């Protein structure tokens, strides 16, 4: 077993995004464009990458462990002919990190073949898998995504789209899915937990991606989101929109705006950059402190720190420099090495920090151990005072919708109040963005977001969770609405 030690020593505090998906229909360079789009989504998963393309009704596949640049080169891309392709970058939330679990997955069934790439997590995966295995299904991976293929294969319907609908009726949790058949590209979204957008290139090629930054990189114009509860079908006849659930109430992951998405993306119809800037501004308004300089924990705290500094009228400076060159070093972890982790990733700028009252803006605190190391690092560089400002509310509950978070017991905000956390990390003051304030910033969109990690109230009931600690959504009957455009 190998472990990405250096990636974990700094980023172990952060919830890890689950995956990123791409789908392209109608471009002769589909696989190459797909690989470029996956580069733009690399932040959503670094454990593996894969692309499946279709040419003359034959599926061609290249999957590998590691970064997109590790998996794909010109020789590999030449093995992926065709004008239609789907791609995936993986961070495992259900299933182990090994090649067999790297998506997209491809399977044959009675009426053809299908490939799938999934961003999210099925909360009823275990019970679905057990039921399928009882009925004779044989699984090749430990990924929750494989159940979708089995559900499609065992559906009693013949048309592929009806098989997809049949499968979705059994799924609970978070899923943004792209499917590829011999002649169709299909995108499906659930309650809207995870983002999925649609764009178009100048030659008419249709593109789906987890974030708009992927569209930007391949010169595709953003058109709209795939709506919660929607299936979008692309084939030689054009584009059809199929509504699975009428008036589906979205439950969008707020952490996309706090941490996961790139700042240059538009997610859930909002600029991620503007969201983070406003989070920083409101922190400066609601939790001011006398200071000489504002710095960020790079990279995810930068935009919020800019907002804080602008509102407070205090200079923003780079007090911490992040190294991007040690994260792919694989060695067996040891505590001695872990103790050097933050120093390997973050280098303090003594000239910025020495003798100063420093505000440090970060996007979140999870376990608290990395925050304590950062505070110590800044004080060792000569800072007079260190004031931590966190651009999200305290995280008190785990996520079951495709984000890798620690258990509830490991979350420091579930065990300590703010003052206890301040003492634990060693800062001179500590303040979080209040949940009510966060909701007020979202205005009319506030009811459309999931705040389970801040409240413990789950919009879709996870398996093996105390029902009294969550809310359930009922009414999963699928209805059809057709719109052609």
From Swiss-Prot:
GO molecular-function terms, A-Z: 4 iron, 4 sulfur cluster binding; amidophosphoribosyltransferase activity; metal ion binding
The cofactor(s) it depends on are:
Mg(2+); [4Fe-4S] cluster
PROSITE patterns on file? GATASE_TYPE_2, PUR_PYR_PR_TRANSFER
* First and last residues of the transit peptide: 1-18
Q: Which ranges carry the Glutamine amidotransferase type-2 domain?
A: 19-237
**Domain of life of the native organism:** Eukaryota
EC number(s)?
2.4.2.14
Reactions accelerated catalytically: 5-phospho-beta-D-ribosylamine + L-glutamate + diphosphate = 5-phospho-alpha-D-ribose 1-diphosphate + L-glutamine + H2O
Task: State a GO cellular component annotated for this protein.
Answer: chloroplast
Q: In which pathway does it act?
A: Purine metabolism; IMP biosynthesis via de novo pathway; N(1)-(5-phospho-D-ribosyl)glycinamide from 5-phospho-alpha-D-ribose 1-diphosphate: step 1/2
Detail which positions bind [4Fe-4S] cluster: 253, 399, 450, 453
Q: Which compartments does it reside in?
A: Plastid, Chloroplast
**Gene3D superfamilies per record:** 3.40.50.2020, Glutamine Phosphoribosylpyrophosphate, subunit 1, domain 1
UniProt: Mg(2+) binding residues: 300, 362-363
Listed under GO biological process in this entry are:
'de novo' IMP biosynthetic process; purine nucleobase biosynthetic process
The protein's UniProt keywords, in alphabetical order, are: 4Fe-4S, Chloroplast, Glutamine amidotransferase, Glycosyltransferase, Iron, Iron-sulfur, Magnesium, Metal-binding, Plastid, Purine biosynthesis, Transferase, Transit peptide
Q: What does the record give as the active site?
A: 19 (nucleophile)
InterPro entries attached to this UniProt entry: GATase_2_dom, Ntn_hydrolases_N, PRibTrfase_dom, PRTase-like, PurF, PurF_N
Instruction: Kindly state what the record says about how the cofactor is bound.
Output: Binds 1 Mg(2+) ion per subunit.
Which coarse location class describes where this protein primarily resides?
plastid
Classification via HAMAP family? PurF
The record's similarity note reads: In the C-terminal section; belongs to the purine/pyrimidine phosphoribosyltransferase family.
Can you say what this protein is called? Amidophosphoribosyltransferase, chloroplastic
Taxonomic lineage: Eukaryota, Viridiplantae, Streptophyta, Embryophyta, Tracheophyta
């Amino acid at each position: 077993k190998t472990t990405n030690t250096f990636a974990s020593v700094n980023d172990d505090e952060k919830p890890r995004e689950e995956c990123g998906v791409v789908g392209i229909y109608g471009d002769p360079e589909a696989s190459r464009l797909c690989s470029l789009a996956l580069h733009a989504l690399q932040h959503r998963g670094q454990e593996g990458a894969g692309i499946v393309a279709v040419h003359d009704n034959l599926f061609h596949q290249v999957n590998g462990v590691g970064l997109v640049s590790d998996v794909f080169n010109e020789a590999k891309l030449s093995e992926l002919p065709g004008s239609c392709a789907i791609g995936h970058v993986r961070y495992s939330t259900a299933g182990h990190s090994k090649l067999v679990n790297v998506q997209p997955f491809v399977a044959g069934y009675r009426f053809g073949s299908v490939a799938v790439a999934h961003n999210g997590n099925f909360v009823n995966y275990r019970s679905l898998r057990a039921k399928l295995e009882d009925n004779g299904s044989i699984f090749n991976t430990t990924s929750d995504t494989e159940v979708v293929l089995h559900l499609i294969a065992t559906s009693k319907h013949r048309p592929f789209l009806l098989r997809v609908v049949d499968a979705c009726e059994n799924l609970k949790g978070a899923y943004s899915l792209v499917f590829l058949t011999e002649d169709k590209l299909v995108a499906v979204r659930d309650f809207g937990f995870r983002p999925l957008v649609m764009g178009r290139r100048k030659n008419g090629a249709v593109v789906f991606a987890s974030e708009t930054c992927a569209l930007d990189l391949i010169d595709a114009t953003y058109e709209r989101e795939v709506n919660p509860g929607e299936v979008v079908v692309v084939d030689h006849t054009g584009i059809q929109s199929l509504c699975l659930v009428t008036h589906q109430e979205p439950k969008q992951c707020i952490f996309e705006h706090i941490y996961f998405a790139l700042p240059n993306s538009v997610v859930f119809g909002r600029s991620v950059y503007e969201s983070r800037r406003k989070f920083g501004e409101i922190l400066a308004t609601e939790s001011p402190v006398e200071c000489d300089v504002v710095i960020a924990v790079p990279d995810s705290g930068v935009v919020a720190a800019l907002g804080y500094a602008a509102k407070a009228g205090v200079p923003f400076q780079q007090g911490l420099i992040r190294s991007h060159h040690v994260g792919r070093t694989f060695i067996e972890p040891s505590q001695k090495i872990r103790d050097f982790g933050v120093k390997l990733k973050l280098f303090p700028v003594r000239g910025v920090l020495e003798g100063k009252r420093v505000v440090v803006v970060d996007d979140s605190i999870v376990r608290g151990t990395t925050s304590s190391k950062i505070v110590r690092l800044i004080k060792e560089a000569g800072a007079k005072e260190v004031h931590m400002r966190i651009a999200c509310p305290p995280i008190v509950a785990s996520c079951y919708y495709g984000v890798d978070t620690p258990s509830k017991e490991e979350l420091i905000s579930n065990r300590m109040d703010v003052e206890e956390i301040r003492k634990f990390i060693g800062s001179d003051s500590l303040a979080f963005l209040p949940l009510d304030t966060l909701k007020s910033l979202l205005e009319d969109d506030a009811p459309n977001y999931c705040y389970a990690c801040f409240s413990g109230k789950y919009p879709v009931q996870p398996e093996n969770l105390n029902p009294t600690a969550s809310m359930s959504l009922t009414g999963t009957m699928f209805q059809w609405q057709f719109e052609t455009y």
